[in-house]
């Protein structure tokens, strides 16, 4: 099932018991965060606050608060089915010629999907039903959440920032938080390596001193939103990828103030520009690490137009110590990463980003080990293959007899198969998340790899331990007589 807009997805969630409407007045200042956080930790539904205090616009929260809802947004019922998305991405990143007639036939569905990629331009889009310009532009009329007591100001969190570099044929979609600065001003917090920041840097180089057009879409259809946080191949636009997942082309329209294309079904569109000479101090804000981050200067986004649907819905979230919504997205997208990594490294059995590791700061990988030093090769590959993992500080590699998603197994492997000096890889001066205050320098720190695999000849001179395993015949016999032993429940072993 595919969803052309956010509202059809809301209806689907509500029909399936995955969305709760809240009519009681709730304040976007702190109260919504507390409610959303409690509900998310209880694995509860998405929330639609129908009467935000001092605002008339409903607020949608916790939309992707469980891996199941992320899967539902992509037309799947089970998060494990998201591996199909990963298979598609792996194919798009590195397509292979058919190995024969049967293989060619099996690839036809992927090629047919690829034909649905280009976005479709529409007229009279829903996102431009109401147009506000000049003095009508007032961002304070939006029910923007003020998430934590130490936050400096309300924060736009789920906006799709749309940019285009002067040397690129496609637009970039990225999600960057934006601090409310005034009635028509937001601070665009994008890190220097992100797509939007790179586009802006190219523009400044080619057109020094000129204003850079930017558009932010709020409340787009769920597939387009998720396309912006998925490892889409660099040569493909997020709109094209969203169409690929949806099975039909993404509908877009031209912005009113520039040539950028925006998702036509969006609830709210903010149009404007960034003056290369206008910067402002951003933060502090509570972040996905569970701490308040440092302040720093970022470009100011001046909003010249606000367009929206009639009776728009404001889509919002909060970030904090895991679990939060980004962590739940990470759990779901974990399944997307597995086939992509396996395509490059077939020896990988499974890959896990534990949500308590702030979505990406720690990874555990199980492999079918084939030679001495194999674990270290996989570590280096994971750090370098996808830019999503350039900030991963810790990688643990285990054998295929260890469940990399079970900490009991992983800790056992670390403590029994590792020598701290021999099996630890340390790399200095690598890119680190700017928000990671534990690094000695902002944006630059170290990485640690833990080889918790069984050691082969060449890696050790000692006789290696053999795991204890019960005789299968004995296990089978005990299973057959268990009820006669008078012990209440048979432990699962």
UniProtKB/Swiss-Prot annotation:
InterPro entries reported for this sequence: UbiD, UbiD-like_C, UbiD-like_N, UbiD_bacteria, UbiD_Rift_dom
Binding residue positions for Mn(2+): 172, 238
Subcellular location(s) of the protein: Cell membrane
Membrane topology label: Peripheral membrane protein
Catalytic activity: a 4-hydroxy-3-(all-trans-polyprenyl)benzoate + H(+) = a 2-(all-trans-polyprenyl)phenol + CO2
An annotated GO BP: ubiquinone biosynthetic process
Binding site for prenylated FMN: 175-177, 189-191, 194-195
GO molecular function, one term: metal ion binding
Domain of life: Bacteria
Cofactor(s), names only, from the UniProt record: prenylated FMN; Mn(2+)
Active site: 287 (proton donor)
GO CC terms in record: cytosol; plasma membrane
Pathway: Cofactor biosynthesis; ubiquinone biosynthesis
Family that this chain belongs to: Belongs to the UbiD family.
Entry function: Catalyzes the decarboxylation of 3-octaprenyl-4-hydroxy benzoate to 2-octaprenylphenol, an intermediate step in ubiquinone biosynthesis.
Subunit structure: Homohexamer.
Protein name, per record: 3-octaprenyl-4-hydroxybenzoate carboxy-lyase
């Amino acid at each position: 099932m595919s969803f052309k807009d956010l509202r059809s997805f809301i209806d689907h969630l509500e029909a399936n018991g995955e969305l709760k409407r809240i009519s009681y007045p709730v304040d976007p200042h702190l109260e919504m965060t507390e409610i959303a956080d409690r509900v998310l930790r209880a694995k509860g539904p998405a929330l639609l606050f129908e009467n935000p205090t001092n605002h008339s616009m409903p607020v949608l929260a916790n939309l992707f608060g469980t891996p199941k809802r992320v899967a539902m947004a992509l037309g799947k019922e089970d998060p494990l089915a998201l591996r199909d998305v990963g298979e598609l991405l792996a194919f798009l990143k590195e397509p292979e010629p058919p190995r024969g007639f049967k293989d060619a036939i099996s690839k036809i569905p992927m090629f047919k999907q690829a034909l649905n990629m280009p976005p479709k331009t529409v007229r009279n889009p829903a996102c431009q039903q109401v147009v506000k310009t000049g003095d009508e532009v007032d961002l304070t009329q939006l029910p923007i959440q003020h998430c934590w007591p130490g936050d400096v100001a309300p924060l736009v969190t789920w906006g799709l920032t749309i940019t285009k570099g002067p040397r690129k044929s496609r637009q970039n979609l990225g999600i960057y938080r934006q601090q409310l600065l005034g009635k028509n001003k937001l601070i665009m917090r994008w890190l220097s390596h992100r797509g939007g920041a790179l586009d802006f840097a190219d523009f400044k180089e080619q057109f020094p001193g000129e204003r850079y057009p930017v558009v932010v879409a709020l409340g787009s259809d769920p597939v387009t939103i998720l396309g912006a946080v998925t490892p889409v191949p660099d040569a493909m636009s997020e709109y094209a990828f969203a169409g690929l997942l949806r099975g039909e082309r993404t509908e877009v329209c031209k912005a009113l103030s520039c040539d950028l294309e925006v998702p036509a079904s969006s609830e709210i569109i903010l149009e404007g520009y960034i003056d290369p000479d206008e910067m402002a101090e951003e933060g502090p804000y509570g972040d996905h690490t569970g701490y308040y981050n440092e302040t720093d200067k970022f470009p100011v986004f001046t909003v010249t137009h606000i367009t929206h649907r009639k009776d728009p819905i404001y889509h919002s979230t909060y970030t904090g110590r895991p679990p939060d919504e980004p962590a739940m997205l990470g759990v779901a997208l974990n399944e997307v990463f597995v086939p992509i990594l396996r395509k490059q490294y077939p020896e990988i059995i499974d890959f896990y980003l534990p949500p308590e590791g702030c979505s990406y700061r720690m990874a555990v990988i199980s492999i079918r080990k084939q030679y001495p030093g194999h674990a270290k090769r996989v570590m280096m590959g994971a750090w370098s293959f996808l830019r999503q993992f350039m900030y991963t500080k810790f990688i643990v590699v285990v054998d295929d007899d260890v469940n990399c998603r079970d900490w009991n197994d992983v800790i056992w492997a670390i403590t029994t198969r590792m020598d701290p000096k021999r099996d630890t890889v340390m790399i200095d001066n690598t890119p680190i998340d700017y928000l990671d205050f534990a690094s000695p320098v902002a944006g630059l720190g170290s990485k640690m790899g833990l080889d918790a695999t069984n050691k082969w000849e060449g890696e050790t001179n000692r006789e290696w331990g053999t795991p204890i395993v019960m005789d299968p015949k004995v296990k089978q016999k005990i299973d057959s007589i268990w009820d006669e032993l008078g012990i209440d429940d048979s432990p699962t072993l």
